[in-house]
Curated annotation (Swiss-Prot):
Protein name listed in UniProt: Ubiquitin carboxyl-terminal hydrolase 25
Subunit structure of this chain's protein: Homotetramer, inhibited form. Homodimer, active form. Interacts with ACTA1 (via its C-terminus); the interaction occurs for all isoforms but is strongest for isoform USP25m in muscle differentiating cells. Interacts (isoform USP25m only) with MYBPC1; the interaction prevents proteasomal degradation of MYBPC1. Interacts (isoform USP25m only) with FLNC (via filament repeats 17-18, 20-21 and 24). Interacts with GAPDH. Interacts with SUMO3; the interaction sumoylates efficiently USP25. Interacts with SUMO2; the interaction sumoylates efficiently USP25.
Region (SUMO interaction domain (SIM)): 77-102
Modified residues (Phosphotyrosine): 740
GO BP terms: immune response; interleukin-17-mediated signaling pathway; mRNA metabolic process; protein deubiquitination; response to oxidative stress; stress-activated protein kinase signaling cascade; ubiquitin-dependent protein catabolic process
Modified residues annotated as Phosphoserine in this record: 85
Group of enzyme by EC: hydrolase
């Protein structure tokens, strides 16, 4: 090692130590140098532990057991991700492990530096900090020992768990393991990685190897991972259980189920284990000094750090795996990468050293699979816990990395200088434009064009020759004195025309005194007289002055508009130039295609993970959300992953070399040349394992079928007597009209239909006394139809809906076919209940005869039945709505919710056929949303009480009514109010994470939160629609009018 290298390394170590102490001082507020030095020594240079020790007011060496726990949880890492045994030795490392400790917990710690430090989110260490700040370490260690509770429960019906043909397989969430599912599915869908895992064979002398900790852990994990991958390939189940692999991982993390595992940390640990496992195998199969490790070749690349430290140049080659990127302060992935590749000034402990320091990073070798960690967490010093950054960050489907390659460094430097020059010029232009768009010297600023326009309008207004005060006094003399509030300030409004007003001794002056005591009544005393000008105007201006002023203002306004337009066009051109700076052919030779996006929703201490993975065979995006695997789209991915809109955002991006087709290429049979699919891709031992599992599942299906057959037979035997009784009663029932009229009581028909029918028949009979029943029938039908058309066209208040009074009003408003309307009218006049009235008997007979004469080709019976079925659904929807709103007003929110959910679903189906088929969708949506918010509030209050019974009741409300129905607010058009309501409910529960609470409450909260934060739009449970009681049309109309009137009296902000 050279003297220069010694100097550089010592300088770097001193720099890191001083930076470490500065950070501790900033975070904890402790200025005692001895305490800080002691914390540095006790934590072995680990910032998280030092913060925890100092915050706990214990700067002495902690007990060995505590230290062991934290250090075991710490993954071995350098600044750019684990290199393991593959790291280069004997090189100058100015950016290695030293800085990684700084950036993992606190992104704000180096705000003065342009370099984006690595954050990996909610690691075990960061959660340890949070727990120390919230309670003592001893209290939280009690939470570590508990039984895992499954988030998902298997359906008893195995057919619900049966895999559709060739459908992707999900992974069961076995207790806060959505992080495991997201990462494993992303890697499994890399066919090369899948092949490596499936075809892995442990070393032949594995039984004879010394069982150190790594080998004791890695070999069982590889066995379970192979089994898991084999099931994902060939199982007949919709989803599989990863419990055995997860348990091995959890043991290594020394974690507990109450913590949400961090995707980056887990991926890092997983690749470390895989690297170790394949290294053992590689060393057995080759005698080379450095055997090739397929995991290293797949996931690890190299970069060259070039720079100057205190005036001395250096170069350092390092290996990297997952590449960390800072999100805060950047709008897209390229900006993050640019900041990561160029580091500004490197601080020096020697303040008198004037030598410049800085460095650049250039990729020399990119891995086939390139993973970016998006650092979305920062440490909030005030709250004492990590917080999530929800800023929007865009990323492309194809990422060109030519500009970051070492071989392109010269042309990239030139382009960076050009971009810097353009951005500097852009800043100047934007500042100039801002002066035009925000003009003024006071706190309120306006566009200069508008200022000139307002001045022009004022100058052009018609002058007023009398004082506005005089006008008001004259116009209001009949109605008494005006309140002082309505008088304009004389210093502002009173011009030369008002100078003749009397002085202090005048009557006007004396009359002004009582005006102060007059009570101001809006819309009465202060009403503006109709002859008063609406806008101020200049009192005196000559034609010449006005002409000159208008000319100047017009000219200036045109000049400003031209200048503004020129600036905006120049800014747009510069933006476009910057965007296209790297679009030339030489800079699009290294394409990487987006393979997977790992998404996190929630806050720093808890949340839910899922993955979007590109199906290269079908060329479409798939969403992997635990057991649910669904088709998706780029638009949905963007909505959930870019951030800035909801609490969901991308946390990890996995790109693959677009030219490395072996990553996604299927395996082929060497003899037949056919692609191997499914079980054909599995080695014999795994094929046997999957077949055995499939046989167990098929047996479960057979047993279920047998149980169903036995149950069905028993039900038929029990139902036979009831069926015979029902058939007997059906034969005696009278044949009626549409089934929505079949109520237990016929009084409804007599009040609504019969009375009106009798009235029109009486009128038609009176007008046509000497005519036969057929003529009277035709006249009565015309009269009734005219009445119904008038009702359908009438503009009514919300409480009056004539569609509920008569089916034909509903048909007319929705433009039903003429033949259907005619047939329904004939059924009204042919109703058998009219036979009891002597005047109507013959007319009823004629109507029935005409009904029988209608041929099937004249009226489409299916369409006819469909229209009447829709009307029945409309009436049922109305009853659901009425009952739901009545329960809401009684504050019976659970019952209200169930009825409103049915009303919303039925109404949605009706409105899909026409705008007048159902009720106001916004009204139902509003009260459905309010029900969920009210129930969430009730559940939260019960949880906050801390009483076991209340806590359980609160969680029952959440699990039974909130969690299953939240997805209903996130489907369809996703109204902004619904999305905000969901966010409010989730944030309410996430806020408890930062509060002190009993261990059992913490346990229940952590079990419940992943279900609440699940972004899936899959409905996980739905109650049977509540049964509606028998009701009459009269009752329906009355209750509808009553509830709608009560709503109209509710203030707008209460609805």
């Amino acid at each position: 090692m050279t003297v220069e290298q010694n100097v550089l390394q010592q300088s770097a170590a001193q720099k890191h130590q001083q930076t470490f102490l500065n950070q501790l001082r900033e975070i904890t507020g402790i200025n005692d140098a001895q305490i800080l030095q002691q914390a540095l020594k006790d934590s072995n240079g680990n910032l998280e532990l030092a913060v925890a020790f100092l915050t706990a007011k214990n700067a002495k060496t902690p007990p060995q057991e505590e230290t062991g726990y934290y250090q075991t949880a710490l993954p071995g890492n350098d600044r750019y991700i684990s290199v393991g045994s593959q790291a280069d030795a004997n090189v100058i490392d100015l950016t290695g492990d030293d800085k990684d400790d700084l950036q993992r917990a606190i992104a704000l710690s180096l705000a003065e530096s342009n370099r984006a430090f690595r954050e990996t989110g909610i690691t075990d260490e960061e959660q340890a900090i949070s727990r120390v700040l919230e309670a003592s370490i001893a209290e939280n260690k009690a939470c570590l020992k508990r039984t895992p509770i499954e988030v998902w429960r298997d359906s008893r019906n195995p057919y619900d768990r049966k895999r559709q043909e060739k459908a992707p397989v999900g992974l069961k969430n076995v207790g806060n393991t959505c992080w495991f599912s997201a990462v494993i599915q992303s890697l499994f869908n890399l066919l090369e990685f899948r092949r490596l895992v499936l075809n892995y064979k442990p070393p032949s002398n594995a039984q004879d190897l010394p069982r150190n900790q790594k080998e004791h852990r890695n070999l069982p994990f590889m066995r379970e991972l192979r089994y898991l991958f084999a099931l994902l390939v060939g199982t007949k189940r919709k989803y599989v259980d990863p419990s055995r692999a997860v348990e091995i991982l959890k043991d290594a993390f020394k974690s507990n189920d109450s913590q949400q595992q961090d995707v980056s940390e887990f991926t890092h640990k997983l690749l470390d284990w895989l690297e170790d496992a394949f290294q053992m195998k590689a060393e057995e199969e080759t005698d080379e000094e450095k055997p090739k490790n397929p995991m290293v070749e797949l996931f690890y690349g190299r970069f060259l750090a070039m720079g100057v430290l205190e005036g001395k140049k250096f170069e350092n080659t390092e290996m990297f795996g997952q590449y960390p990127l800072q999100v805060n302060g950047f709008k897209d992935l390229h900006e993050c990468l640019e900041a990561a590749m160029i580091e500004g000034e490197i601080e020096s402990l020697h303040s008198d050293n004037s030598g410049k320091s800085g460095q650049e990073h250039w990729f020399t070798e990119l891995p086939p699979v390139l993973t970016f960690e998006l650092s979305r967490f920062e440490f909030n010093q005030a709250l004492g816990r990590p917080e999530k950054i929800h800023n929007k960050l865009e990323f492309p489907q194809v990422l060109y990395l030519d500009r970051y390659m070492h071989r392109n460094r010269e042309i990239t430097r030139i382009k960076r200088e050009e971009i810097k020059r353009l951005k500097d010029y852009l800043t100047v232009l934007q500042q100039r434009l801002e002066r035009y768009l925000s003009y003024g010297s006071g706190p309120k600023r306006f566009p200069l064009v508008d200022v000139l326009q307002y001045a022009l309008e004022f100058a052009s207004s018609k002058p007023v020759c009398t004082s506005p005060v005089d006008d008001i006094d004259a116009s209001s003399s009949a109605s008494g004195p005006l309140p002082s509030q309505s008088l304009p300030s004389t210093t502002e409004q009173q011009g030369p025309c008002a100078s003749d007003l009397p002085g202090s001794s005048s009557p006007a002056s004396g009359a002004a005194l009582p005006l102060r005591s007059v009570i101001h009544k809006p819309f009465t005393q202060s009403r503006i007289p109709p002859d008063l000008p609406m806008h101020p105007a200049p009192r005196h201006i000559t034609e010449e002055e006005l002409c000159v002023l208008e000319s100047c203002l017009h000219r200036w306004r045109t000049e400003i508009e031209n200048d503004t337009r020129d600036l905006q066009e120049s800014i747009s051109r510069i933006h476009r130039t910057i965007e296209l700076m790297y679009s030339d052919k030489s800079m699009i030779q290294v394409p990487y295609r987006l393979h997977a996006v790992l998404v996190h929703e929630g806050q720093a201490n808890a949340g839910h993970y899922w993955a979007y993975i590109f199906d290269h065979r079908e060329s479409r995006w798939m969403k992997y959300n635990d057991i649910a695997v669904t088709k998706s789209s780029w638009e949905e991915l963007v909505r959930d992953s870019f951030g800035g809109y909801r609490n969901a955002s991308a946390y990890c991006l996995m790109y693959i070399d677009d030219k490395a087709q072996f990553l996604i290429q299927e395996e082929f049979n060497k003899e037949t040349g056919q692609a191997l699919v499914g079980m054909e891709t599995l080695p014999p031992d795994l094929r046997d394992f999957v077949e055995e599992d499939n046989q167990r599942f098929e047996k479960e299906l057979e047993e279920w079928d047998t149980q169903l057959a036995q149950r069905s037979l028993q039900e038929k035997l029990l139902a036979a007597p009831k069926l015979r009784e029902a058939e007997a009663s059906a034969t005696t029932a009278q044949a009626g009209g549409a089934d929505y009229l079949e109520q237990p009581s016929r009084s409804d028909l007599s009040k609504h239909w019969k009375e009106e029918t009798l009235r029109v028949i009486a009128k038609a009979s009176h007008d046509l006394e000497d005519k036969g029943p057929e003529t009277v029938l035709q006249s009565a039908i015309k009269l009734e139809y005219s009445r119904l058309v008038k009702l359908a066209q009438e503009d009514t208040p919300p409480e009056t809906d004539y569609r509920l009074h008569h089916v034909l009003v509903y048909f007319i408003q929705n433009q039903a076919p003429k033949k259907i309307i005619e047939k329904t009218l004939l059924e009204q006049f042919g109703d058998r209940n009219l036979s009891f009235d002597e005047r109507c008997h013959n007319i009823m007979k004629v109507a029935q005869a005409k009904l029988e004469m209608i041929k099937p080709e004249e009226v489409n019976l299916e369409e006819y039945e469909e229209w009447h079925a829709d009307y029945k659904k409309f009436r049922e929807t109305t009853m659901y709505l009425i009952t739901g709103l009545e329960n809401f007003q009684r504050e019976s929110y659970i019952d209200s919710l169930l009825f409103l959910l049915c009303a919303y679903q039925n109404n949605k189906e009706l409105l899909s056929k026409g705008p007048y088929r159902g009720h106001d969708g916004e009204l139902i949506s509003h009260y459905r949303r309010e029900c969920l918010l009210k129930l969430n509030e009730q559940a939260a209050e019960l949880f906050e009480s801390g009483e076991d019974g209340d806590v359980n009741n609160g969680l029952i409300i959440m699990n039974e009514f909130i969690v299953p129905f939240l997805p209903l607010l996130l489907v369809d058009d996703m109204e902004e109010k619904d999305i905000l309501a969901v966010e409010d409910m989730r944030n309410r529960w996430c806020s408890y994470l930062g509060q002190e609470m009993e261990a059992n409450l913490q346990e229940k909260l952590t079990d419940f939160l992943p279900k609440l934060l699940d972004c899936s739009t899959e409905i996980k449970g739905f109650h049977e629609p509540p049964k509606l009681p028998s009701y009459s049309a009269h009752e329906l109309c009355e209750r509808f009018a009553r509830i709608m009137l009560s709503l109209s009296r509710t203030p707008a902000d209460g609805r």
